[in-house]
Amino acid sequence: MIPQGHSPLGGSGAGRFLACPGSVSLSKGFVPEVEEDNSFSAPGTAAHEVAETALKKGGETWRLIGTKAENGIEIDKEIVDAAQVFVNAVKSEHDPATWEMGVNAFIEQKFHRPELHELFYGTADFVYVDTPARTLHVWDYKHGAGVLVEVKDNAQGKYYASGVLQELDLWGEIDNVVIHIVQPRGFHSSGPIREWSVSTEQLGNWLYDTLIPGMDKALVSRETKAGMHCRFCPVRWAACPALAKVMDEIEEMLKVAEEKGGVNKLTMTQAARFVSLMAIGKIAEKAAYEALHARAQKGQKIDRYGLKLVKADKHRIFRDGAEDAAVAEFGKKRAYETKLLSPAKIDGLPNGKKFTAEWAYKPEGGTRIVLADDNRVGVKREKASGVFKKEEK
């Protein structure tokens, strides 16, 4: 029997507990001062439900606008539009006419493989087995917009793929696995639909050499390591030794900068380290902000600390009935805006990728500095001395 709920060593946390095994032990029994804000996760759960319904029943997602998901969230146009990108992408890649449910097509495929590890269980959004090509396709829908999910070497994707191969007993039938991530609301340089391939041999090596030993270690280890994986760690609100060490080092770097006359006087090594530390420090700062905000909401005074509680900015919205009134006042043509879908949204349409391959392009943009483990391709710049020749007198 497959356990209910999320595994404490599930796929969504694999990237974190493999990097920081101590986060699992530190999280046990920890009750954060601030409750997780489900205003971000709840619409994603509803979008998953919309996509699941559309894939199972073959209908269009827009028909669900105005209904309520099981978690009580009202399904609106934004949720439907995002879910439809996922549905279109799946159908475009795998012709529904070829689907045999439970044979080569699986929606919300659950797995639990205690022979690998008691806590090895989860649910894959959509799975397609291409037997002639000896290829398994594992699809994962991401509703979030704030954190872009990279598909290359994605720990959650590999976790789910391993679980599905084991659950369906396909290790001997499949040579290659394609992991698909669809993130319609996040702006990614590769678009909202991304994929990455891995051989079953490589995946099996990762499963037995990295994942399972990592799961065992996470159950007993107190070893912590700070990184961008801290964004989703429950202990980011607690006394995490790794985050505390980062904050101490930031303080030391600020002292060095002061002695040198400013952060712009730091050496390349010092500046690079400072930027890396601050990227992680912002995670702790965000957790502190959320805790402070929760206290202020309950009436605790924060004025003495040079802060105050204010109303959040909101854009104006129309009251009920405004749509009909606007059409009557301005006419339908002037009241509504019609424009071409973005290349990212066109990608999700049938034959969309073929169209954008011909018609879409990336204009030249600026540059920015990111952490080294970011999957974007690095840009090389020559030193000025290597570009310009000395003027001959």
Language-model-detected regions and their locations in the chain:
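Hydrophobic/aromatic-lined pockets within catalytic cores
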Residues: L55-G59, H143-G146, A161-D169, D216, ...
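Short, glycine/acidic-rich hinge or "gate" loops at secondary-structure transitions
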Residues: W62-I65, L170-V178, R295-G299
